[in-house]
UniProtKB/Swiss-Prot annotation:
<keyword id="KW-1003">Cell membrane</keyword>
<feature type="transmembrane region" description="Helical">
    <location>
        <begin position="284"/>
        <end position="304"/>
    </location>
</feature>
<feature type="active site" description="Tele-phosphohistidine intermediate; for EIIA activity">
    <location>
        <position position="612"/>
    </location>
</feature>
<dbReference type="InterPro" id="IPR011055">
    <property type="entry name" value="Dup_hybrid_motif"/>
</dbReference>
<dbReference type="InterPro" id="IPR001996">
    <property type="entry name" value="PTS_IIB_1"/>
</dbReference>
<keyword id="KW-0808">Transferase</keyword>
<dbReference type="GO" id="GO:0005886">
    <property type="term" value="C:plasma membrane"/>
</dbReference>
<dbReference type="InterPro" id="IPR036878">
    <property type="entry name" value="Glu_permease_IIB"/>
</dbReference>
<keyword id="KW-0813">Transport</keyword>
<keyword id="KW-0762">Sugar transport</keyword>
<dbReference type="InterPro" id="IPR050429">
    <property type="entry name" value="PTS_Glucose_EIICBA"/>
</dbReference>
<dbReference type="GO" id="GO:0090563">
    <property type="term" value="F:protein-phosphocysteine-sugar phosphotransferase activity"/>
</dbReference>
<dbReference type="GO" id="GO:0055056">
    <property type="term" value="F:D-glucose transmembrane transporter activity"/>
</dbReference>
<feature type="transmembrane region" description="Helical">
    <location>
        <begin position="137"/>
        <end position="157"/>
    </location>
</feature>
<feature type="transmembrane region" description="Helical">
    <location>
        <begin position="364"/>
        <end position="384"/>
    </location>
</feature>
<feature type="transmembrane region" description="Helical">
    <location>
        <begin position="12"/>
        <end position="32"/>
    </location>
</feature>
<dbReference type="Pfam" id="PF00358">
    <property type="entry name" value="PTS_EIIA_1"/>
</dbReference>
Length: 688
């Protein structure tokens, strides 16, 4: 149950990134538009007073502001799109549902335009400060103020309606409304019910949120910033940080702007204060990112490079330079964080604590810098330096230098003191035991602590999954020495990455435990999977095309630590939008897992690719999959390989994200194209 809930939270967190991804563009428009009539800048560049320039700046500012003003609607549409696999019908249903939900709440609670507007000086002016802040005008509808929470709720419900009813059949006389056309209809009914329910349930929630907001922001804000920084970074590996920071950025706190509008949420308040030209009071939950993203993590990258073995410095240097520069410029830190998260968790613990102190220090110094994307140099210029007199952004530089020094020396000390296997410090060569292929299942069973220590045994095409009684009896180093490319430990659950032979090992281990296999000569592990390295260097150059219609995401965003950590190899994540997986190149089918959820292919030039459809889909036991090919069959690029029931997978698997891994990259170079929207004819990767 927890695992399923965790998977759903990951999907929601990922879905929230879609509306959040719009904010950088809106923020840039707002920041530049506002900056173009900034008094200090106008004094330096008087030409900014030109009427045409003033009009352009006003349009830019208004274009950016309207996005922030309608965030709840964007969250409704974005959440629905994310949870429904990107189908536009779900987005339309969310839009309709959001409007109906707000209209329903307004009518049930008898909210009128007079509850929103006050009349003064003969004109209608928005005066939320003098009215009930629990009410709002949403796209012309007087209603209850539910903020982005209302948008997320309606978006999630619209996605549920889509996944539940998108292929519904109706009697012939209602046939026009069958299938996807039925989704907005049923969503409308759900929206009415939701509006009625929220009319009575949301006011107490509002009171609770306001009380929590007052406690966190007014009574104990200093401690809150520290705790916020720790929790936000701690959730990065699980992909749940988007869920955590959303209330702080978009709901907690309130400010009435010069137009009389009530603005909620730390990020939105900062943007409103930027436009109003008043001193900043918001930014406590954004500013803390700048010191560790721009200075701390790049310094940590240098410490990792410095401690790499001499023969590995060139490779590690390139990796760390790229990751460190990305963190500095854009605030995208996952490539760097994931480079040491799995191999040296103690470093990530240090990083989490330092991130918390960064938020605390920035708050104590009164630095207030907003952001839309992340705490990199680009946002620092737009929202910090251009407003340096109000934001006190210059203090980030000395504080950042201190953090760079602290990060460097703490990482350097920990790496040497605890002999951490950071990039470039891995064992030069894992000793391979003198174990015949046939004896491998016996040796793996012994390394897991023996028959009595096995509580549950399972496998998929990438890994051996074992739940043990006593984890202390497991010889992790021994498992790696037997050929596992990595071992993941979650509680008493061990995942050993043996690649395609994992299922054969599991099969033989089960037979050994039951007494059906008593000697190595009776095992079924094949010769080709044993003493020879699992990976074979590819020959030639291979173009790899998209395996279907969908979205391409970085491998680091795949919600599975084994794939995201590149334990199986490098590649990309693919989010299918249609239920057909096709061949990414001309080649041969090498493996089809018994549960049909994974396919191994080999190109004509020798590149081996694993397509793993969904996450934890091995547990579906083949339900939702229809194989269209056989092992050893020749295939051509674009040829259908598998039919997939996406609706079934969305309902029964943690995620439909499909890792596409190059399993024998070795010393070859993988070039990943800058592609997001993909179809079978689009190039996504090249192995050189």
């Amino acid at each position: 149950m927890f695992k399923k809930l965790f998977g759903q939270l990951q999907r929601i967190g990922k879905a929230l990134m879609l509306p959040v991804a719009i904010l950088p563009a809106a923020g840039i428009l707002l920041a530049f538009g506002n900056a173009m009539h900034n008094e200090q800048l106008v004094e330096i560049a008087p030409w900014l007073k030109n009427d045409i320039i003033v009009m352009i700046s006003s349009v830019m500012e208004a274009a950016g502001q309207v996005v922030f003003d309608n965030l709840p609607l964007l969250f409704a549409v974005g959440t629905a799109l994310g949870l429904a696999g990107g189908d536009g019908v779900a987005a339309l249903a969310a839009l309709v549902g959001y409007l109906i939900m707000n209209a329903t709440m307004g009518k049930v609670l008898h909210i009128t335009i007079d509850d929103i507007f006050s009349y003064a000086k003969g004109a209608k002016e928005l005066s939320q400060a003098a009215k009930e802040p629990a009410h709002a005008l949403v796209l012309g509808i007087p209603t209850l103020q539910t903020g982005v929470f209302g948008g997320i709720i309606m978006g999630a419900l619209a996605a549920w309606c889509y996944n539940k009813f998108y292929n519904i059949t109706l009697p012939p006389f209602l046939g026009f409304f069958a299938g996807k056309r039925f989704v907005p209809i049923v969503t409308s009914v759900v929206a009415i019910a939701t509006g009625v329910l929220l009319s009575f349930a949301w006011p107490p929630i509002q009171d609770g949120l306001n009380s929590l907001s007052n406690f966190l922001l007014n009574k104990n804000l200093t401690l809150t910033t520290f705790i916020f920084g720790i929790i936000e970074r701690s959730l990065i590996p699980f992909g749940l940080h988007h869920i955590f920071y959303s209330p702080f950025w978009f709901e907690f706190g309130s400010y009435t702007n010069h137009a009389g509008e009530l603005v909620r949420g730390d990020q939105r308040i900062w943007m409103a204060q930027l436009k109003d030209g008043v001193p900043f009071t918001a930014g406590a939950f954004t500013t803390g990112k700048y010191p560790f993203m721009m200075f701390g993590l790049p310094a940590a990258a240098f410490a990792i490079y410095k401690n790499a073995r001499p023969e590995r410095k060139k490779v590690v240097g390139g990796l760390m330079l790229s990751a460190g520069l990305t963190a500095f410029l854009t605030g995208i830190t996952e490539p760097l964080e994931f480079s040491f998260l799995f191999v040296a968790p103690v470093l990530y613990g240090i990083h989490v604590l330092l991130a918390g102190t960064s938020f605390l220090v920035m708050h104590l110094l009164g630095v207030k810098i907003g952001m839309t994307f992340s705490g990199g140099f680009i946002d620092y210029i737009l929202y910090g330096l251009l407003n340096w007199d109000r934001s006190h952004a210059l203090l980030v530089i000395p504080v950042g230098i201190v953090y760079a020094i602290v990060y460097y020396f703490l990482f350097d000390f920990a790496i040497r003191k605890f002999k951490l296997k950071t990039p470039g410090r891995e064992d030069e060569e894992t000793e391979i035991r003198n174990s015949s292929v046939a004896k491998l299942p016996f040796d793996v069973l012994d390394a897991m602590g023996g028959k009595e220590n096995i509580k549950h045994l399972d496998a998929c095409i990438t890994r051996l999954r074992v739940e043990v009684v006593d984890k202390s009896k497991v010889d992790v180093a021994g498992i790696k020495a037997l050929g596992a490319s990595g071992v993941l430990e979650v509680g008493n659950n061990m995942q050993a990455i043996f690649g395609p032979k994992s299922d054969q090992i599991k099969h033989d281990m089960a037979k050994i435990m039951s007494g059906e296999i008593t000697k190595p000569s009776e095992t079924t592990v094949t010769e080709e999977m044993s003493d020879e390295p699992v990976h074979v260097e590819a020959l030639g150059t291979t173009d790899i095309y998209a395996p279907g219609v969908g979205q391409i995401i970085p491998l680091s965003e795949v919600p599975d630590q084994v794939f995201a950590g590149k334990m199986m190899g490098d590649g990309i994540g693919f989010i299918p939008e249609k239920g057909e997986i096709v061949a990414p190149f001309d080649g041969t089918v090498k493996t089809i897992f018994p549960t049909k959820h994974a396919i191994g292919l080999e190109s004509e030039s020798g590149v081996e690719v694993l397509i793993h459809i969904g996450i934890d889909t091995v547990k579906l036991n083949g339900e939702g999959f229809e194989s269209l090919i056989n092992v050893d069959e020749k295939v051509t690029q674009g040829q259908p390989l598998m039919k997939v029931n996406l609706a079934y997978l969305k309902a029964h698997a943690p995620s439909i994200v499909t890792p596409m891994i190059i399993t024998n990259l070795e010393n070859k170079e993988l070039v990943i194209e800058d592609v997001q929207d993909a179809d079978p004819g689009k190039l996504i990767m090249t192995v050189k």
